[in-house]
């Protein structure tokens, strides 16, 4: 009798993806984040579904419906904070996952990488729209500021903004459509994750050495299933601690004030995971220039395969490039800090310098260093 795991049309796909998948024998804990992101997505969809059962997408009742979830629904506070902090965990893992890809040259899998960048955009859009739903002060003003950026598009800009708003300002129509999109996008993301994995399994995983690992591959199960479960336990521990001890640590106190179109908060800022891009946006005095810099700061990831000049794939044996990548990481931390600061001296100047160095490191210094390292190794 044939093995069902290997013969059943559906189970066979799962088998080739998670059980008998040939995996390099030397991949480190940096390869855990893919599975952790999958778990995060599942947590977000489940908690989001339960929140949607009690939430009302109407300007008059949205804020009080969230309060009702926290006060009156059984474990509603837990579901709400798991969803909010789950999003933060999602982005932490996303940034680690991308950082791993940059360090080990995983971006040379062009299809997988490009689908990943599109996934990043989709997750960012979903998170932004989700932040609008509680209809607090920061929800309302964040939505107003970010949607207004589209008015910088020549000729069609102002019309496009009013079309997205469904009126002449952020109002009931905006909230309703944001809820609809926020609900449907995670399912589109799930489908894209499957495409992401499909492309990855065409080539197989990269590994820390950046060398071909076809001669030394082991089955995914049980080796990496166990390793992933360890990562999962760490994730669940940290997420649980965050939810139960300081659930509002990463949130904004302004969002506990109901949205008021007549009262602008002194400092409008997005959630922490968008602050680096927000800092780049604010560092350019011109509106259109700022919007272009904002989009390009993420879109630049797609250029990495083209900018790769080194004859080695990974940075494991390239100390100068390693140093540059860590400088880039520090630069992003500085940008994140600046994004949360008021627009005044010296923060404006620091933000502008950090924005310039962000693009310079990626577009000029990294390719030059790769080329130079080839010369140093007489390649």
Swiss-Prot record:
What Gene3D superfamilies is this protein classified in? Cytochrome Bc1 Complex, Chain C
Organism domain of life? Eukaryota
Instruction: Outline the subunit composition.
Output: The cytochrome bc1 complex contains 11 subunits: 3 respiratory subunits (MT-CYB, CYC1 and UQCRFS1), 2 core proteins (UQCRC1 and UQCRC2) and 6 low-molecular weight proteins (UQCRH/QCR6, UQCRB/QCR7, UQCRQ/QCR8, UQCR10/QCR9, UQCR11/QCR10 and a cleavage product of UQCRFS1). This cytochrome bc1 complex then forms a dimer.
Q: Name one Pfam family in it.
A: Cytochrome_B
One annotated GO biological process: mitochondrial electron transport, ubiquinol to cytochrome c
Q: Which GO terms describe its cellular component?
A: mitochondrial inner membrane; respiratory chain complex III
User: Does Iron show up as a keyword for this record?
Assistant: yes
Purpose = Component of the ubiquinol-cytochrome c reductase complex (complex III or cytochrome b-c1 complex) that is part of the mitochondrial respiratory chain. The b-c1 complex mediates electron transfer from ubiquinol to cytochrome c. Contributes to the generation of a proton gradient across the mitochondrial membrane that is then used for ATP synthesis.
An additional note in the Swiss-Prot or TrEMBL entry is:
Heme 1 (or BL or b562) is low-potential and absorbs at about 562 nm, and heme 2 (or BH or b566) is high-potential and absorbs at about 566 nm.
Q: Which InterPro entries match?
A: Cyt_b/b6_C, Cyt_b/b6_C_sf, Cyt_b/b6_N, Cytb/b6-like_sf, Cytochrome_b, Cytochrome_b_C_euk/bac, Cytochrome_b_N_euk/bac, Di-haem_cyt_TM
Q: Which GO terms describe its molecular function?
A: metal ion binding; ubiquinol-cytochrome-c reductase activity
The subcellular location is: Mitochondrion inner membrane
Q: Which residues bind heme b b562?
A: 83, 182
Write down the species.
Proechimys simonsi
* Protein name (record): Cytochrome b
């Amino acid at each position: 009798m044939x093995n069902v795991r290997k013969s059943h049309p559906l189970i066979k796909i799962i088998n080739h993806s998670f059980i008998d998948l040939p995996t390099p024998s030397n991949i480190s804990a940096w390869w855990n984040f893919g599975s952790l992101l999958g778990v995060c997505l599942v947590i977000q969809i489940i908690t989001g579904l339960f929140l949607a059962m009690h939430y009302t997408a109407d300007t008059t009742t949205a804020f009080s419906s969230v309060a009702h979830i926290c006060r009156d629904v059984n474990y509603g506070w837990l579901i709400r904070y798991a969803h909010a902090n789950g999003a933060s965990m999602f982005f932490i893992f996303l940034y680690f996952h991308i950082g791993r890809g940059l360090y080990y040259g995983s971006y040379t899998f062009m299809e997988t990488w490009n689908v990943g960048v599109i996934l990043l955009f989709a997750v960012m859009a979903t998170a932004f729209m989700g932040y609008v739903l509680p209809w607090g002060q920061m929800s309302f003003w964040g939505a107003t500021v970010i949607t207004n950026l589209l008015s910088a598009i020549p000729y069609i800009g102002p019309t496009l903004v009013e079309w997205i708003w469904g009126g002449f300002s952020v109002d009931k129509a905006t909230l309703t459509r944001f809820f609809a999109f926020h609900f449907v996008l995670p399912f589109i993301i799930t489908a894209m994750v499957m495409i992401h994995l499909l492309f990855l399994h065409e080539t197989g995983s990269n590994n820390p050495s950046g060398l071909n690992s076809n001669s030394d591959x082991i089955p995914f199960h049980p080796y990496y299933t166990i390793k992933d479960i360890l990562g999962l336990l760490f994730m669940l521990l940290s997420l649980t601690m965050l939810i139960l001890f300081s659930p509002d640590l990463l949130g904004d106190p302004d969002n506990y004030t109901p949205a008021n179109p007549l009262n602008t908060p002194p400092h409008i800022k997005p959630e922490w995971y968008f602050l680096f891009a927000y800092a780049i946006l604010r560092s350019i005095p011109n509106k259109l220039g700022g919007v272009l810099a904002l989009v390009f700061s993420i879109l630049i990831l797609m250029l990495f395969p083209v900018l790769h000049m080194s004859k080695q794939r990974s940075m494991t044996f390239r100390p100068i490039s390693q140093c540059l990548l860590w400088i880039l990481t520090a630069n992003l931390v500085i940008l994140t800090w600046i994004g949360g600061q008021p627009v005044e001296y010296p923060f404006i100047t620091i933000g502008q310098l950090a924005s310039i160095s962000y693009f310079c490191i990626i577009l000029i210094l990294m390719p030059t260093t790769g080329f130079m390292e080839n010369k140093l190794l007489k390649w």
